[in-house]
Amino acid sequence: VYRIYGRVNRTEPGPPDPVPVTEDSPLRDKLYPYRGLDLPFPESEKQRLQDYDKIPIERLVMNDPAIQGTVLRLPAVYGPNDGQHRLFEFLKRMDDQRPAILLDERMAQWHHTHGYVENVAVAIVLAITDERAAGRIYNVGEAHPLPMIEWVRAIAKIADWHGNIIPLPSDRVPSHLVPDIDTRQDLLVATTRIRKELGYREPVDLDEALKRAVAWERANPPKEVDAKQFDYAAEDAVLV
């Protein structure tokens, strides 16, 4: 919902917003942000996203005096049943025993707040069961998000992969690995409010979360894989 999403997706041009954003930070001005975008999703999912936006629902709930509503703004949720398979692009390369994973040097330092699915579920239950949550808005996510290169290293540790992670200038990165976002804008959210007001703490630490996520991803790979996103010949040409 935040303007930083418009910045990173280039739908709301402007200088990068300061991060981490709080619950009081500016929201997107443009509603229905997925309309008109060529998204790498199945056609049914593309159609659903045409009318997808959380901001109108938030306004409806928070402005209705008859509803004791709570809004939770969730992070990039990973783990079992992750329909977006957030670990797959890295884990597949690791399991294919690639010698190296290439990252655009800008992407290597980019931050995005994640949340393991069970930890996010705990936050949801807490908001439902704690009366102090009524009428409040809370960001949910990990307390200390990693830059992308460290995120990949954390996955590699769990996957028992010992290759190299190589940041490269944009002009040397194969075209399928060039970021389609504005990496000057980090997607970092502050989760201080829910921790202070409701005492939220993650029951599953990062290592255990990634162990469970990697195990699920290996057992449940995507049914369709875009071969163009795994152009190993182009990646090998850079490594020579």
Regions found by a protein language model. Give the residues of each.
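A contiguous, mid-protein "functional segment" used to position or interact
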Residues: 1, 8, 195-227
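NAD(P)-dependent short-chain dehydrogenase/reductase
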Residues: 64-111, 119, 154-155
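Conserved loop-to-helix N-cap of the C-terminal "lid" that shapes the substrate pocket in Rossmann-like
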Residues: 71, 111-121, 137, 145-149, ...
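Mid/C-terminal beta-alpha module of Rossmann-like enzyme folds, strongest
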Residues: 123-186, 191-193, 211-212, 221-240
